Structure formats: C-alpha cells, structure tokens
C-alpha cells in the first residue's frame, strides 16, 4: 500500500495520513495558530500569493496554508482517487 497524497493547489501535495484537520482561517484561534507556527518556523505557505482559504494542521505540528477551499480539500481527501487534478 502506497502513500496517499492530496493536491492542495498549484501542484502542491501533502500526505493524507498526516493530516489532523482542515479548517477555515477566519477565526481568532486559527489566526493565533498560524502566527505561532510562523514564529516557530513550522508554517508552510502554499497559496502562491493568493488568499488563504484553508489551513491544514499536520501531525508534525506544521501548519499549511492553501488557497483551495476546505471543502475541496476534504473532498479530495475522502472523495476521488484522482488526486492530481487542479480544482
């Protein structure tokens, strides 16, 4: 059995097995998590300069910012097997 990767936009992929949660960046607690990750060097910005629409928390305490909607990332995680399509 191979490692399953999820496309989070613009050709960026993350390991599906290591995702803890996928959330919207709008709430104050999530903004604090993003700032803490930035200060500790564990923030990965995969937005390519676009608006952050999803925040992905990994089991390694890394925080990944994506410009893809959280629902889209979740659908890619639990939905289709074709994970290389851009959405």
From Swiss-Prot:
Pfam families with a match to the protein in the record: RemA-like (PF04025)
InterPro entries in UniProt: RemA-like (IPR007169)
Family: Belongs to the RemA family.
HAMAP family: RemA
Record protein name field: Putative regulatory protein GWCH70_1057
